[in-house]
Swiss-Prot record:
Family affiliation: Belongs to the anhydro-N-acetylmuramic acid kinase family.
GO molecular function: ATP binding; kinase activity; phosphotransferase activity, alcohol group as acceptor
Residues where ATP binds: G9, T10, S11, M12, D13, G14, I15, D16
Signal peptide range: none
A family per Pfam: AnmK
NCBIfam families linked: PRK09585.1-5
This protein's name: Anhydro-N-acetylmuramic acid kinase
Lineage of the organism: Bacteria, Pseudomonadati, Pseudomonadota, Alphaproteobacteria, Hyphomicrobiales
GO BP: 1,6-anhydro-N-acetyl-beta-muramic acid catabolic process; amino sugar metabolic process; peptidoglycan turnover
Cystine bridges: none
EC primary class: transferase
Protein's job: Catalyzes the specific phosphorylation of 1,6-anhydro-N-acetylmuramic acid (anhMurNAc) with the simultaneous cleavage of the 1,6-anhydro ring, generating MurNAc-6-P. Is required for the utilization of anhMurNAc either imported from the medium or derived from its own cell wall murein, and thus plays a role in cell wall recycling.
Pathway involvement of the protein, from the record: Amino-sugar metabolism; 1,6-anhydro-N-acetylmuramate degradation; Cell wall biogenesis; peptidoglycan recycling
Organism of this sequence: Xanthobacter autotrophicus (strain ATCC BAA-1158 / Py2)
Length: 373
């Protein structure tokens, strides 16, 4: 079936929309994709929504600006789908399903609570197409971490490649997550630590620029290894998979341990970028076997400084091959959007989305809620 997958990640920079042909088991093809960037007003609304979400006690709570943000992003997701279809000279009648992740504003699996804002019924009524949404809730309610969700999609893609195993697929969004695939063994997955979020927030606070384009600011700075070691002492980095993070979990901790307020712009950016690489490398000793191949996707794949730091830190442990998703025929920018198209098709068939080795769920679990006209 033809599915449009939608993703608005923790970097909060925009909506990725991507077309995929899949039956929820095999991937027939990965189609075109686009990004609908958030304007400054929408991003500010989402930043405030993240703050207001701290008052959530139940997954239906919408304190502060959350209701307004939910309506706004739903309508923008509809716009993203229409733009993608227009680009391809298609209409909504040409697709079978939409996979709608929504925007994560609160993620506390220890409290069995995760909230992704987005109105599935409003989206299906706008587009006239069935919508699968709310992918994480069932896993979290059962005691799983609710993240990462994409490992089963990574497994379907990696099966088509001829790369030395184990293969690690690293997505560097606001939070970084990894899937480790080793032959026929169940996929192992977890969040590794901060991805782009801390770097983006630091740059924006200092310069009002939303991200470090091409890692140029970090490339001019000097990494403070002692401050990175302070952060790596946190118990999270010694905890084996599965494990997950909220976007803001390390914001205060890193700010205090690194003394970011006292660091210059370039050195702060360099040290935060190196921290992302270091937290990925810190996972390797916790795995049964070190990955021989790494495929990097997400915004981090567009940051040459981060990629160089990853190569240096991963290569210090074992000889590895690090490449970006684009080099294996995937879209580094749209991989998660493609994933949610795949997961939507999978959920429609009642197939498992998560596994004990990926989220800590007690058993393989399906998920998602289907919205129809």
């Amino acid at each position: 079936m033809r599915v449009v997958g939608l993703m608005s990640g923790t970097s909060m920079d925009g909506i990725d929309a991507a077309l995929i042909d899949t039956d929820g088991e095999e991937v027939q093809w990965l189609g075109a994709a686009l990004t609908l960037p958030y304007d400054a007003t929408t991003r500010a609304l989402l930043v405030q929504a993240m703050e207001d979400a701290r008052g959530i006690n139940h997954r239906t709570d919408r304190p502060g600006v959350l209701r307004a943000a939910e309506i706004r992003i739903t309508d923008l997701h509809a716009q993203a789908v229409r733009q993608l279809l227009d680009q391809l000279r298609l209409t909504p009648s040409d697709i079978d399903l939409v996979g709608f992740h929504g925007q994560t504003v609160f993620h506390r699996p220890d409290a069995r609570l995760t909230v992704q804002i987005g109105l599935g019924q409003r989206l299906t009524e706008s587009l006239g197409v069935p919508v699968m949404a709310d992918f994480r809730a069932a896993d979290v309610a059962a005691g799983g971490q609710g993240a990462p969700l994409v490992p089963v999609f990574h497994r379907a893609l990696v099966r088509r490649l001829s790369l030395p195993h184990p293969v690690a697929v690293l997505n560097v969004g606001g939070v970084a997550n990894v899937t480790v695939l080793d032959g026929d063994a169940p996929p192992v997955a977890c969040d590794t630590g901060p991805g782009n979020a801390l770097i983006d927030d630091f740059l924006f606070a200092r310069t009002k620029v939303p991200f470090d384009a091409d890692g140029r600011t970090a490339a001019r700075g000097t990494v403070d290894e002692a401050r990175i070691a302070e952060v790596l002492a946190h118990p999270f980095f010694r905890q084996p998979p599965p494990k997950s993070l909220d976007r803001n979990d390390f914001r205060l901790f890193v700010g205090e341990r690194m003394g970011l307020s006292g660091m210059g712009l370039e050195d702060g950016a360099a040290t935060l970028t190196a921290l992302t690489a270091a937290t990925v490398a810190a996972l390797v000793p916790l795995l049964a076997r070190p990955p021989a191949s790494w495929i990097v996707a997400g915004g981090g794949a567009r940051n040459p400084t981060l990629l160089a730091m990853l190569v240096a830190r991963l290569g210090a442990q074992v000889s590895v091959d690090v490449r970006t998703a684009d080099t294996v025929g995937w879209s580094a920018d749209a991989l998660e959007a493609h994933a949610f198209g795949y997961l939507a098709a999978r959920a429609l068939k009642g197939l498992p989305l998560t596994f004990p080795t990926t989220t800590g769920a007690p058993e393989p679990m399906t998920g998602g809620v289907l919205f129809r006209l």
